[in-house]
């Protein structure tokens, strides 16, 4: 592990220790073999946690179950409701009444993680958020997800939402085993809607060899979550990471766990996923103080560009000794290297039943271009207006926004004050001269 990354992880550990006893035991991590259902590595695997957008895996499961039963098809048109359209980002921004096929909705859901699309699926299948949540919880109970409860289809903050690493691995395994014909949904590198290209928020897709799914999630209270799958030499593994301090750390931790998992073998001593002991904790910890209420740039769901990182050390276990580690882990150092994503051809998605014609695509592109130009013009006008207002003030101190702190290294705040002894009436004289000049020009015309 390089020095900078070690310092970041250590800083997170210290922050977690300061954040309370609930955080002092580290964050959940789990590696499971799909074929056998046996556990290769587990840490706090049954502790309750806020799921954030990995909730959308259960939304997908409920939808695919309806397709399997014949109640829906992948061509079924879903209608965007007022409630769905009103949800906060991440979203597509579809207007109420817009219709979209279920297959396109699922692609957008799993790649873009759009909350308005999740709610559209829920409203059309369950009749309402509560109705769909009841379907989600019924499926969770049937699958044996004993530590999970879902209150909405998207994972936006709600204290009633909770899950565990174990339960999400059960769900991922069910999706893989029960719906093999739809596995391609989970490893789409990017989707394209009109001129917009949206890449998968899963930082392993296109970067980790063999990565083939599934879903990321992030809210301040959960930290950075991921349920990931990868295949190597015919062997399929599921890795769950909950509560990572950043999107990059989430990706790197999952990659390290996969490497160690593929270097380990399952035998009779490995417990089955369903046999993991229950946690003594009843409620999820709130990670907000560690993840969001701290100095620095605002956390982002997607990975920033990552330089390849090598790791020939054990996965840092900074807190807990109650961990089921990989067999022979210390004897098998691994080298985890992640480079930039490989280029992918985005899958086109659209609204309506049929894909748009070339003429319709051109018209849509023109409309989007006009809308973008209008937004830029509005931003420019707003910036110009703010600049004029700032120019009127005698003292001006540039303000660095929270999200720009990472870009502002070396930048200092400058206070502009009137020079001592300067004639305060000078600007007025200048204005008078300008007015006289203007009158002269008017007279000449």
Walk through the language-model features, giving the residues of each:
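Bacterial N-terminal signal peptides that target proteins for export
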Residues: 1-10
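Domain-terminus/edge residues, biased toward the C-terminal soluble/receptor-binding domains
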Residues: 146-149, 157-162, 166-421, 428-429, ...
